[in-house]
Amino acid sequence: MEGYHKPDQQKLQALKDTANRLRISSIQATTAAGSGHPTSCCSAAEIMAVLFFHTMRYKSQDPRNPHNDRFVLSKGHAAPILYAVWAEAGFLPEAELLNLRKISSDLDGHPVPKQAFTDVATGSLGQGLGVACGMAYTGKYFDKASYRVYCLLGDGELSEGSVWEAMAFASIYKLDNLVAILDINRLGQSDPAPLQHQMDIYQKRCEAFGWHAVIVDGHSVEELCKAFGQAKHQPTAIIAKTFKGRGITGVEDKESWHGKPLPKNMAEQIIQEIYSQIQSKKKILATPPQEDAPSVDIANIRMPSLPSYKVGDKIATRKAYGQALAKLGHASDRIIALDGDTKNPTFSEIFKKEHPDRFIECYIAEQNMVSIAVGCATRNRTVPFCSTFAAFFTRAFDQIRMAAISESNINLCGSHCGVSIGEDGPSQMALENLAMFRSVPTSTVFYPSDGVVTEKAVELAANTKGICFIRTSRPENAIIYNNNEDFQVGQAKVVLKSKDDQVTVIGAGVTLHEALAAAELLKKEKINIRVLDPFTIKPLDRKLILDSARATKGRILTVEDHYYEGGIGEAVSSAVVGEPGITVTHLAVNRVPRSGKPAELLKMFGIDKDAIAQAVRGLITKA
């Protein structure tokens, strides 16, 4: 990349021809589909032609080769031109482009990873640059390889705050292997973009965030070649002045054409006009990459030893998480940790102390942190663990949702769950997160109740596909499991039982310990209860729950430091629905809480040992 060598006129003309073929393919595909975004594709035609057939280094028949340059189409609605690129490169049959958006085709309306050339799903705007930052960070600091990362954004999505979180991150970590291309085509979906073509303001904003920013004519292949050839020791933003619908007579730079395919007759005429400008049908071959990315194996990463806790000793699961993650970090140099400036209360600082080169401080930008993790995880380069207060993951729900669509393997640990955090009050209390994470299609939801099982959860999460969420607690609680206890995803544990149990009580985290304390109270009254630890709330151990319920006259009592909606109670109710003779009673937080001591709040909201004991008595009396 050092120095710029101007392409000769033949190469420049070939790039112009390529751009026009990409335009034609985008128009043909969207017209055949009867939907799509041809105007958004046409503004980016020269950008995509120069990127893929002059600048980028990749193996066209092996899109996910670890040595390849990376590309993220943040403006995912321009998917047809991405598909056209891979047809131009010879990876896709050109005829397949006409199956765009059909249920029988892999060419969805927006990019998805069932396409071999798509690392992450895009289409929810504002997220691509954060993912690209994760890829670039991995390339520079973990792989130490020469591959570069390119991200194409639309001007409409530059109103998203997450874009600027990513801009700040890239500057802080000097990601000079990252190039963002801003397709400034002036028009948004329903109105012009706020800055329209005020290119100097875009440039000043990028420069203020610590980027090298250059303005180019986005329809000049020569200017684009020069801009991409300028290596800088900082991230680069290429601010391309373009026109939406470029090349479409009567549509170019006109409002009200967003997301509208051209009618067939109009498309045929426009295609003839564009085709007449093409001088050669000869295609440009992709330039292969430098093969210097290390071989990586992230399969079957195991703890180097068993846990070393003593039954009865006390530790908060949030601290046990930090210790466990640091321990797992010794098993593989591909375990990485990310945090949102909460590394002291989440205890990820323990990992940072032991593995400083694999800790990424993302600061107070949780949306971007999740996107960074998704980027780091692409092509199976790392196993990322993100941590912050669980309440703050709620603002990143769209990123988490898109991570699932991206088939991403990331691990999220949320601490400070429920009213049991005490005096900090409701803004810090995660009371919705079980509902949130249970709703994600690829999720596994861990809810550890002591130090031993927290360590097991971390190990299992590292080896479980999809989005893993570990819900940790602030209070210190006793170790209840032996160090050699085996745990599996979807396998609950009976923590307390007798042959005379009358109610099955299911609690997790703090409330499991309250249930055990309630059992001691009830034992004095000659009332025995069975206490279950679900371990994973998703998937739930339906068989053990049903077996326990049938052994306790069909009575189940759930108790949780969470709102009623979407938590353990509703998960258990869903699992046993339709089973004859089984009833489920819920104890949960029923309103927005307040500050107070943990014990006071557990009592106020009816989820402490006394409330559990009272509910058990009521169930027995009712019978």
UniProtKB/Swiss-Prot annotation:
Chain ranges passing through the membrane? none
**The keyword Phosphoprotein is assigned to this record:** yes
| Pfam families named among the record's database cross-references | Transket_pyr, Transketolase_C, Transketolase_N
Q: Which residues carry this modification: N-acetylmethionine?
A: M1
Q: Give the InterPro entries listed for this entry.
A: THDP-binding, Transketo_C/PFOR_II, Transketolase-like, Transketolase-like_Pyr-bd, Transketolase_BS, Transketolase_C, Transketolase_CS, Transketolase_N
Instruction: Kindly give the Gene3D superfamilies that the UniProt entry links to this protein.
Output: 3.40.50.920, 3.40.50.970
Q: Identify the catalytic residues.
A: E366 (proton donor)
User: Phosphoserine occurs at which residues?
Assistant: S104, S295
Q: Which UniProt keywords apply?
A: Acetylation, Calcium, Isopeptide bond, Magnesium, Metal-binding, Phosphoprotein, Thiamine pyrophosphate, Transferase, Ubl conjugation
Question: Could you state one GO biological process linked to this protein?
Answer: pentose-phosphate shunt, non-oxidative branch
**UniProt: thiamine diphosphate binding residues:** S40, H77, G123, S124, L125, G156, N185, K244, H258, F392, Q428
Q: Does the keyword Transferase apply?
A: yes
**Can you name this protein?**
Transketolase
